[in-house]
Amino acid sequence: MISHVKFVGIPTRDQDRALAFYTEKLGFRIATDQPFNEKQRWIELRIGDSPTGWVLFTPDGHEDRIGTFFNGALAVDDVEATYEQLNGKGVEFVSPPKKEAWGTFAIFKDPDGNQFVLSSR
């Protein structure tokens, strides 16, 4: 039986730039950073104590997927406060905080154009 999500692959053009973005701007921590092949490393990040890894890696032949990841949602206690904090760090938002009946959300993108949702719990 499936127990949890082990990792999610985030396609990236420049692993060093993506690593700096996710760790310095978003506060992810490095779980693994090791050579994978001649061109790339296996970089796996974590958020807090979550068992799910975020892997900054693009398999050969899948470069067309860079910038197409969409709608991964990150839970935060306060969308507006997190928006202000990340916006102050230079994170680019495509949608400022919006309140809906189901909660508040905002959408930002990483340096490759992959988009993620900040969502209230």
Predicted region positions:
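Short, charged/polar surface micro-motifs in flexible loops or helix N-caps
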Residues: 48-53, 62-64, 79-81
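N-terminal beta-strand motif that seeds the catalytic metal site of vicinal oxygen chelate
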Residues: 1-19, 69-72
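Conserved beta-strand in the GNAT
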Residues: 54-57, 116-119
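Vicinal oxygen chelate
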Residues: 14-15, 65-66, 71-115
